[in-house]
């Protein structure tokens, strides 16, 4: 057991954010009859738990360029992909602008005019494209990933095991959607029936449909909508979802990217935030 006096609490909390904790992260506050406050790692009948966010690291970097609404390039040339979100693509030699892509990029450029940003990583720090994965913060503490969602400039895209801030991100999206901000008011991102899915559907999309059966193999479990359309969930992520039978026979909105194999269409779902019961 350890105790921390009241006047040392601020220093303790600062260290909790800046360095790895080498002791328990459940901290309890208690106060005696004379008003003396102590903090302990052991609960008592009179104590209450103090919420501590452990193992959160933020490192200062300098941005050289904004690639698009969810990717920045640091001074050392490394690309950083913002975690937990997706913004529409911007024009390059392979594709045209997606609606809302330029607006997201311009917004991020305006936020990063002084080029200073703090990076906070999660469980997986780099993707298959060798990009760093991070939550971005301004020096004043503004969470840019979250703010993009709040302004309707991005959509939630949570990929396990990077689940940090998932609840806050989902809530921000729900509020922007409710207010029809940004992309939530754009015709290109309104839900369409899965029965109308085609190879013309590119980028992030919203679909509606009712699953009728479940099929499982070694790697994926699939919710089947008809003989040409399914959504698939990696079996290693199933614990994040309610029992998939919960979805059977119920209208769903599905959010994600369509892949095609011959005349069959499939949408890979990583997190239950992409499946919304209607």
Regions found by a protein language model. Name each.
Residues 2, 23-278:
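Small beta-barrel nucleic-acid-binding modules, primarily SNase/OB-fold domains
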